[in-house]
Amino acid sequence: MVNLTIDGQRVTAPEGMTILEVARENGIHIPTLCHHPKLRPLGYCRLCLVDIEGAAKPMTACNTPVAEGMVIRTSTPVIEEMRKGIIEMLLSLHPEDCLTCEKAGNCQLQDCAYTYGVKHGELPVKREELPVLKENPFIVRDYNKCIVCGRCVRACQEVQVQRVVDLVGKGSAARVGATKAGAEVSLEEGGCVFCGNCVQVCPVGALTEKAGLGQGREWEFKKVRSICSYCGVGCNLTLYVKDGKVVKVRGYENPEVNNGWLCVKGRFGFDYIHNPDRITRPLIREGDREKGYFREASWEEALALVSQKLTQIKGSYGSEALGFLCSAKCTNEENYLLQKLARGVLGTNNVDHCARLXHSSTVAGLATTFGSGAMTNSIADIASADCIFVIGSNTTENHPVIALKVKEAVRRGARLIVADPRRIELVNFSYLWLRQKPGTDLALLNGLLHVIIKEELYDKEFIAQRTEGFEALKLAVEEYTPAKVSEVTGVPAGDIIEAARTYARGPSSTILYAMGITQHITGTANVMALANLAMACGQVGKEGNGVNPLRGQSNVQGACDMGGLPNVLPGYQPVTDPGVRHKFSETWGVPDLPGEPGLTLMEMMAAAQEGKLKGMYILGENPVLTDPDVSHVKEALKNLEFLVVQDIFLTETARMADVVLPGASFAEKEGTFTSTERRVQLLHKAIEPPGEARPDWLILNDLLLLMGYPRKYSSPGEIMQEIAGLTPSYAGITYERLEDKGLQWPVLSLEHPGTPVLHREKFSRGYGQFQVVHYRPPAEEPDEEYPFLFTTGRNLYHYHTVISRKSRGLEEMCPAPVVEINDNDAARLGIREGEMIEIVSRRGKVRVKALVTDRIPRGQVFMNFHFHEAAANLLTIAALDPVAKIPIIKPVL
């Protein structure tokens, strides 16, 4: 600690803090323009000049560290005149269009001019007038207003680490520009990912959101805090609302999640909520599914028909003839009500959702080894790790804000190991790139364990005190020598050895993975192998380590938590446990609940095709595009006697329904999402749903009442009270407690602070359980007829199958599907860039444009699954992981 005096006030501060930081901490104001608390201080603007006793000249407070005995004066006549002169210089170079500027009311230059009484600039300096750049769908750049503070440059280079923009020119001609190889280019040509974080930190009107142009002044907006509706990171947002419309979005400063940073979808992809294609009234099909049509109906008629048909099917065929799909895009409260309808009113455990296709192997694998099938650590932890092992996750495109934490850790000195067949962006930041063949992850992971055990790098004390089954694992991995694993995976033996040593030595090592690990015939075994690796090295139960599945959708974790699975009630309480069933049935006021696990999503589709499943209720899911072997899915849905779809758009699945119920988007309702890090967070209603659309919880509550269930909920908060009373991990959650930063479950009581790190003292199951798992080849392998390996995944500008395609800007950036093919393979086959080619598998074929690249290895092709025009899942296989029943979405052609 150091002692110093600021403006006569004696203060004590930690060594290394800057004068500006210490002053602000003690309530002393020093003006700044270039400074931003989340960016490296550079002292560009000079507004923060202060007088330091004994110094030869004034010093910039933003980047001058405090020292013992310093005596600082932040405001003297000389300093004040210098600040006025700086502001006058900036105004002399600045357009005087404050009356019409989008930044008016939120402009820091305007604030400084007001504070110091500088009305306009009169210095004889001029700047060449520059064109206003509007070449992309998201950001308007007016560099005439640029004050060369460098904030946007630092956000791009230090936070996003894209290095697209930089300072160009000198003196009064200095400004910011996008550059590539020394030449000025458009943002897109420069490699911009349009996160818009530069817009968020810009202190003036040089960078603005195109969507907000002319839509309102700062003081006219109602600002509503919410949570992003895209991926599972749970980024906090501020919605800017005027005249019942969301005009723009800014990142909300929650330091435990996104710290204000966003990606292109979170910041600019919100406009789908106002798309004219929204369903605004209930629809009822007239005629059959082949030649029939939809007509609009009242809510009374639509819900009465749904109630009648579901009751009729139960009466005629039994409860097991019904199936329900929960939604990873709807709130916890809504998922809770749907599974309650299925189990408590209609008597079936045939309840599942899209987690079956993505992370059901995570739930099965981590529940077996650790006792809890969720991310062990916090997103914020990632930045403090010493080693980060990313496997099966294209993090920069699928979870861009988590990728910022990875980049932050690397900048701090962490070693990044990336295991991926494709040259994903994180490879550019990696210490090691393990380019394994698709489907060989288990061999690779067992190979890492072989090295760790052989070289005795494992944590003997942790294993002895907190785990069981290690000796069996030790014997099992003996055969996975680096040489043998290299032969199977294609990864050099030396890289396998170095990766094992780096991970084991940490000191803090974290694992991040996604669907590249889970969507395999050995998906559950892959997850267990990751758990084995972490337990062997004692890398569980502390900050900066753990095993961290990155969940794909905004509330996929919550849908699982709420019992959107066929074998568990909310809180992962087994349906087979009589005590659990009694607790729920007593609270719900219904007879005993069904005690046998229900059908999974894929089993429901098979049962529908066989004529055993007669009716389905699908909430906010689109299996016609997202499920594997979609031809099979379409046939299954056609075979149903009755199909209800509740959604905000007429999706490919909704088009096959008998009744379509229009729900509400995230901005149009209250409720909670649970993010990938187990953080339960509040949604706040910002606008009304369009037309007669209703919040989904209200639709489900009305249907429950119509079907004879007597409980009428007054609000989602009341539903959460019921959830908390039945679910131990949510027991201490109330809406009031979630208002600040949310809470990470388990939250065991109203006094419990939440759990950022799982398994600190012991595992949820008691002892961690090592599992012996062995590599086996993929469900299909290349042959002469189908020689290519085919994999699927996401694109940065899209999310799943519908909502991002209803966002004008996102669709403009990526309007059509492409298939990535290696440049050597393309040359051999005579395929040119942009040429339409046909991709054929044993199950179907699609026509799509070729993207020729060295990003993907020879013998492999990659395609996004977002597009109905070329549905990737026409090609995929419905083979299942034997444990989690997850389908294999990594087939061959």
Swiss-Prot record:
Family matches, as PROSITE patterns: 2FE2S_FER_2, 4FE4S_FER_1, 4FE4S_FER_2, 4FE4S_HC3, 4FE4S_MOW_BIS_MGD, MOLYBDOPTERIN_PROK_1, MOLYBDOPTERIN_PROK_2, MOLYBDOPTERIN_PROK_3
Residues reported in the UniProt entry to bind [4Fe-4S] cluster 1: C146, C149, C152, C202
Name of encoding gene: fdhA
Name by which UniProt lists this protein: NADP(+)-dependent formate dehydrogenase subunit alpha
Organism phylogeny: Bacteria, Bacillati, Bacillota, Clostridia, Moorellales
Reactions it catalyzes: formate + NADP(+) = CO2 + NADPH
GO CC list: cytoplasm; membrane
Family designation: In the C-terminal section; belongs to the prokaryotic molybdopterin-containing oxidoreductase family.
Record flagged with keyword Iron-sulfur: yes
Domain 4Fe-4S ferredoxin-type, residue spans: 137-167, 183-212
Thermal properties of activity per the entry: Optimum temperature is 85 degrees Celsius. In the absence of substrates, the enzyme is stable at 70 degrees Celsius but is rapidly inactivated at temperatures above 73 degrees Celsius.
Domain 2Fe-2S ferredoxin-type, residue spans: 1-78
EC id: 1.17.1.10
Main location: cytoplasm
Organism: Moorella thermoacetica
Keyword Repressor: no
Subunit structure: Heterotetramer composed of two alpha (FdhA) and two beta (FdhB) subunits.
Class in the EC hierarchy, top level: oxidoreductase
Domain 4Fe-4S His(Cys)3-ligated-type: 78-117
